[in-house]
Amino acid sequence: MMNKKDARLRRARQTRAKIAEMKVNRLTVFRTNSHIYAQVFSECGTKVLASASTAEVEVRKELDGKGATAAAATVVGKRIAEKAKAAGVETVAFDRAGFRFHGRVKALADAAREAGLKF
């Protein structure tokens, strides 16, 4: 019997396989109970081009230590878009890592789009 984590990882594997066929940069989101992380991977999937999270000192100061909120995800979305643009990345494929496109994941994606990242 498959538990909740295994089901999420199965969904993530399917998504990553489709993105690998497309040969585009990938914006990956990882969510925990206390933080949210975002990374932009290269087309081959082996190199991290940009990263942002609520665990970063600058973000923690801005959020007063509350890293598990939609507002925190919005800040991370803006930062990852800025860092990706600085690395020369304009378009990405969004990899939600099997998480539902709702709440913090959606807030991060919307903020990244507003900051100019195309996906």
From Swiss-Prot:
**Pfam hit, one:** Ribosomal_L18p
Superkingdom of this protein's organism? Bacteria
Report keywords, A-Z: Ribonucleoprotein, Ribosomal protein, RNA-binding, rRNA-binding
What InterPro entries does the annotation carry? Answer: Ribosomal_uL18_bac-type (IPR004389), Ribosomal_uL18_bac/euk (IPR005484)
Record-linked CDD domains: Ribosomal_L18_L5e
Tell me a GO cellular component: cytosolic large ribosomal subunit
Any one GO BP annotation for this protein: translation
Q: Which GO terms describe its molecular function?
A: 5S rRNA binding; structural constituent of ribosome
Instruction: Describe the protein's quaternary organization and the partners it interacts with.
Output: Part of the 50S ribosomal subunit; part of the 5S rRNA/L5/L18/L25 subcomplex. Contacts the 5S and 23S rRNAs.
Query: What NCBIfam families would the database entry show?
Result: L18_bact (TIGR00060)
What does it do? This is one of the proteins that bind and probably mediate the attachment of the 5S RNA into the large ribosomal subunit, where it forms part of the central protuberance.
- What protein family is recorded? Belongs to the universal ribosomal protein uL18 family.
Protein name as annotated: Large ribosomal subunit protein uL18
Give the gene symbol.
Answer: rplR
